[in-house]
A protein has these predicted regions:
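Active-site-adjacent structural elements that line small-molecule/cofactor binding pockets in enzymes
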Residues: 1-154
């Protein structure tokens, strides 16, 4: 495993663009995906859908070459909500910040996790199966909502 220092922890580099992901592929043991794509017109970042995440994962795998089996993939979960009204509010709040195809089906946005703890845990398993993501980062304001999901996802 690669680390920034011989006895140090594995290096994690996270990003979305080609340049940073190439650096990550060359040096990191853990490669994180932020899940937000820069608008081509210089506008605000947009939450990516599954297609965009798949493209980024494929790009990284291509850049890793023979190192692919040595590297763990990480995804930043931007927000976690329960089901019902909480999920609806989450998706409506973030809909303007999604790429167009993801806004049609906000539940397909990999970085937003909503639903019952069982459904959310199943979603994490789906992301692992489909994209090979085995490491998830959750922001502090979603940690309590994530706790029952974690218990079911193990």
């Amino acid at each position: 495993s690669r680390s920034p220092q011989p006895a140090g922890p594995p290096l994690l580099i996270a990003g979305w663009g080609d340049r940073l992901l190439r650096v990550a592929a060359a040096h990191a043991r853990i490669i994180g995906f932020t899940g937000a794509a820069a608008a081509r017109d210089g506008g605000p970042l947009l939450l990516a859908g599954e297609r965009q995440l798949g493209e980024r994962v494929d790009f990284v795998r291509g850049a890793l070459g023979e190192r692919a089996s040595e590297v763990e993939l990480n995804l930043l979960i931007q927000r976690v909500a329960g089901d019902g009204a909480a999920a609806t509010e989450l998706f409506e709040t973030y809909r303007p910040a999604m790429v167009a195809e993801a806004a049609v089906d906000p539940r397909s946005v990999p970085t937003l996790l909503a639903g019952s703890p069982e459904a959310a845990a199943e979603r994490l398993h789906e992301l692992r199966e489909r994209f090979g993501i085995s490491y998830f980062t959750v922001l502090e304001d979603s940690m309590e909502a994530f706790a029952p999901i974690l218990a079911r996802a193990r």
